[in-house]
Structures are given as structure tokens and as C-alpha cells.
């Protein structure tokens, strides 16, 4: 496996079209686009890495996998009264669909859906308490207490997050939010600003590899049926309106973030994290997707067969 990971890294290093870093969040715009990291953690707990696997990056929307997991733990199926389970087909920050569907977001991975999930997790707690809870959970699944929120990225997002504020106010106008908009947004922007390495992120995804149990720690995180359903949502909705393309090319449940990261799950096989800051036109990591495409070709890990 290390040879496969190393060969993918060397191939990605040689590619010149690396996409473009997200420029609408100032703190992300200054990230070096030439960085690349890939980590594979197998079901048995073996770790294979190449590139900048110890470099922290902003996980952004990948955090929505963890907040969704938490919300389902708190609310169970009642969550689905607040957010749908269908692919959107629209950009991740689109307001059009939200208007047509009465303020109920299409799925928990688009921005409006993740804002609704953040509201659900809050209950009636303050953002500070909720964020401590989210951070505790991410540290738990990664088995790493050093994971933290990058406050500079969070502030950068809050200063440039007008579209997300519009989404939240729009949902509030339909009485879809329980908490004040500013508090929900503060929670949302901060959990998107969690920083992790690919090694930490791949470890954090391990519970989705083994039917809800992290074999590295022996801890059950979610029931078996819930792990399966989270994976199904990642497959259908994890790459916004590029989810079909990702399923076609890679064939794994995955969740991307505009920081250039992707968490991909090969059920029964491995948790994979890749980071390359340059994005394609939809907003997913360009080389990250290409690297995962190479990985499944080499391993036969696509859920659709060899």
C-alpha cells in the first residue's frame, strides 16, 4: 500500500493543472496551491501517508460529516423534518432551491443544510458550548486531543459570509431555525474552521469504515445502520453538484471541503484523506479527486466493483 500511495503522490507532484484555491475566504486564498497530502488508514489501523500529511489545513465542509453524525445521535430520524436527503444539483450556496422548498434544505451537506444541522445540535445552548461539544466529538473520533479551530479562518468566514447569512435568514423567515441567526452562523463558521492533517482526518473517518465502530480504538461511535446511511449521503451529496461525477470517477462515499480536502470511505477497507488546495470549477479539490481516482484503480476499492 505504501508503494501505491507514494506513486500517486509522485504523479500528483508532476501535474501542472492544479485548479485554483478558494479566493472568497481571505485566509484560504493565501494557501500554497502546490501542497499535497494523502493518507490511507486501513481497517486494521495501518497508516500509509505521502506528502504534507502532517500539515494542518481547514477542513471546511468536511466538518459537516461530523455535525450530521452528532445531530443524528441527538435527534435521530426527527432530524429529517428539518433537512432533506436528496442531491441538490445546484451550487452549495444556492438560495433558489431553498425558496422553492419552503426553507427546508435539500440535504445536510449543502450550506443551508449544514446551517440547519448546526441549529439542531445547538438545542438552546450558546455557540461556545456547542462548539466545545463538536470539537470534543471530532477529537474523540480522531483519537487526538490536539485538534482545534483556527480562529483566523473563522473570523475570515464571518466577514465574507453574506451568502450564508442570507441562507440562514431565509430559513428563519420560514421558521425553520430554533436559535437566533447570528448564533447559528457563529457555530457554523467555527466548525467549518476546524484544522486537521490528512492523518488526523483519515483516522476521524474510521468509524464509517467498520459499520460505526472505530477498530483502532475499539469504540462504537454510531449504530451500524447509521454508519451505512451517512455513507450513502456522502456518496449522493458529498460533492455538491459534482457528486455524480465523483461517484462515476471514484465510486466511494466522500465529502469535500473548499479548503481542498476530501474524506473518502472505502467500507470494510480504509478511510482516506487527501488534501490539495486547488479546486475545480465546482469547488472540489482537483488533484484530490484525481488522486482518489488513481487509488481506486490500483486497489479495486470502488463500491461498484473492480
Curated annotation (Swiss-Prot):
GO terms for molecular function: glutaminase activity. The keyword Methyltransferase does not apply. Keywords: Hydrolase. It catalyses: L-glutamine + H2O = L-glutamate + NH4(+). SUPFAM superfamilies: beta-lactamase/transpeptidase-like. Substrate binds at residues 61, 111, 157, 164, 188, 240, 258. It is an enzyme of class 3 (hydrolase). Its EC number is 3.5.1.2. It comes from the Bacteria. One of its GO terms (biological process) is glutamine catabolic process. Belongs to the glutaminase family. Homotetramer. PANTHER family: GLUTAMINASE. NCBIfam families: Gln_ase, PRK00971.1-2. HAMAP family: Glutaminase (MF_00313). This is Glutaminase. It comes from Pseudoalteromonas atlantica (strain T6c / ATCC BAA-1087). The lineage of its organism: Bacteria, Pseudomonadati, Pseudomonadota, Gammaproteobacteria, Alteromonadales.
Amino acid at each position: 500500500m505504501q508503494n501505491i500511495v507514494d506513486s500517486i503522490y509522485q504523479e500528483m507532484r508532476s501535474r501542472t493543472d492544479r485548479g485554483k484555491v478558494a479566493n472568497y475566504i481571505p485566509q484560504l486564498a493565501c494557501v500554497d496551491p502546490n501542497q499535497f497530502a494523502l493518507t490511507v488508514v486501513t481497517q486494521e489501523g495501518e497508516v500509509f501517508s505521502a506528502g504534507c500529511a502532517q500539515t494542518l489545513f481547514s477542513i471546511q465542509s468536511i466538518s459537516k460529516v461530523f455535525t450530521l453524525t452528532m445531530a443524528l445521535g441527538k435527534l435521530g430520524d426527527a432530524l429529517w423534518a428539518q433537512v432533506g436527503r436528496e442531491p441538490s444539483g445546484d451550487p452549495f450556496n444556492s438560495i433558489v432551491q431553498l425558496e422553492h422548498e419552503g426553507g427546508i434544505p435539500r440535504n445536510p451537506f449543502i450550506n443551508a443544510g449544514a446551517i440547519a444541522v448546526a441549529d439542531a445540535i445547538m438545542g438552546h445552548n450558546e455557540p461556545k458550548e456547542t462548539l466545545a461539544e463538536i470539537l470534543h466529538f471530532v477529537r474523540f473520533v480522531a483519537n487526538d486531543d490536539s485538534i482545534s479551530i483556527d480562529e483566523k479562518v473563522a473570523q475570515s468566514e464571518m466577514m465574507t459570509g453574506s451568502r450564508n447569512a442570507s441562507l440562514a435568514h431565509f430559513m428563519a423567515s420560514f421558521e425553520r431555525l430554533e436559535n437566533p441567526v447570528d448564533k447559528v452562523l457563529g457555530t457554523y463558521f467555527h466548525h467549518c474552521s476546524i484544522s486537521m492533517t490528512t492523518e488526523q482526518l483519515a483516522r476521524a473517518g474510521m468509524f464509517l469504515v467498520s459499520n460505526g465502530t472505530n477498530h483502532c480504538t475499539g469504540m462504537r461511535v454510531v449504530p451500524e445502520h447509521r454508519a451505512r446511511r451517512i455513507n450513502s449521503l456522502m456518496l449522493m451529496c458529498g460533492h455538491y453538484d459534482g457528486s455524480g461525477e465523483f461517484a462515476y470517477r471514484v465510486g466511494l462515499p466522500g465529502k469535500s471541503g473548499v479548503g481542498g480536502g476530501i474524506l473518502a470511505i472505502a467500507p470494510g477497507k480504509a478511510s482516506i484523506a487527501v488534501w490539495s488546495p486547488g479546486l475545480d470549477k465546482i469547488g472540489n479539490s482537483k488533484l484530490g479527486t484525481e488522486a482518489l481516482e488513481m487509488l481506486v484503480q490500483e486497489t479495486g476499492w470502488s463500491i461498484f466493483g473492480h
